[in-house]
Amino acid sequence: MAHQAHSYHMVDPSPWPIFGAAAALLTTSGLIMWFHYSSTTLLTMGLLSMLLVMLQWWRDVVRESTFQGHHTPTVQKGLRYGMILFITSEAFFFLGFFWAFFHSSLAPTPELGGQWPPTGVKPLNPLEVPLLNTAILLASGVTVTWAHHSITEGNRKQAIHALTLTILLGFYFTALQAMEYHEASFSIADSVYGSTFFVATGFHGLHVIIGSSFLTVCLLRLIKFHFTPNHHFGFEAAAWYWHFVDIIWLFLYMSMYWWGS
């Protein structure tokens, strides 16, 4: 980008949006191939392509913000609005899953045995692994806030410790969720209960993985001295996203695990 005499967000032409779209197409096509033909070749190609695009796109954004100084206060304001709108759209995305769940559970059809959970489905105990996962995500919300306060106070060492702990809690949550899926007595094919449960909690789990990846990039940037007390929107966006994931989990726990069981 040539030298600019204004504070507005004018980006260079970038190949990453179209490459990202192609990688997403490969990934979703690969999922279909995996589901129907048990072939993971296309899915692996899609995931690797997506990872490469993410790394190079992040590299460009880091260069523009940290080294070229293009993320002026005006640009940061626009990025904040963008992140708020993105999180709002994600909230409506999950609203659809809650709608499907309550539509099915509040008036169970004769095909479900006229009851909820449906006949033959043994729900998970909400006081076991789900409760532990709730405690883990709430604790991670505390540690990410601790990291944010440490950055604003210029305490880099403490921020690194807090952010590392947050990431470890995120991966611990993912491991427990995978174990829970493996040990569940029902599958995604077991009536509308299995469908809504696995789709809603599965997409939430995907968001936890995305948030953990986002925070990991922030940790690497923090170690490399990219953040200052006044200039750390990359971390702020990741923290907002992480708090959103926390809140969605609380609604999932209260509705699908506790009330729905």
From Swiss-Prot:
UniProt subunit comment: Component of the cytochrome c oxidase (complex IV, CIV), a multisubunit enzyme composed of 14 subunits. The complex is composed of a catalytic core of 3 subunits MT-CO1, MT-CO2 and MT-CO3, encoded in the mitochondrial DNA, and 11 supernumerary subunits COX4I, COX5A, COX5B, COX6A, COX6B, COX6C, COX7A, COX7B, COX7C, COX8 and NDUFA4, which are encoded in the nuclear genome.
EC assignment: 7.1.1.9
UniProt key word NAD: no
Membrane topology category: Multi-pass membrane protein
Gene that this polypeptide is encoded by: MT-CO3
CDD domains: Cyt_c_Oxidase_III
Any one GO molecular-function label of the UniProt entry: cytochrome-c oxidase activity
Mitochondrial matrix compartment spans: 1-15, 67-72, 153-155, 224-232
Keyword Cell division: no
SUPFAM superfamilies noted in UniProt: Cytochrome c oxidase subunit III-like (SSF81452)
Homology family: Belongs to the cytochrome c oxidase subunit 3 family.
Protein name (database record): Cytochrome c oxidase subunit 3
InterPro entries, per the entry: Cyt_c/ubiquinol_Oxase_su3, Cyt_c_oxase_su3_dom, Cyt_c_oxidase-like_su3, Cyt_c_oxidase_su3-like_sf, Cyt_c_oxidase_su3_a-hlx
Keywords assigned by UniProt, alphabetized: Membrane, Mitochondrion, Mitochondrion inner membrane, Translocase, Transmembrane, Transmembrane helix
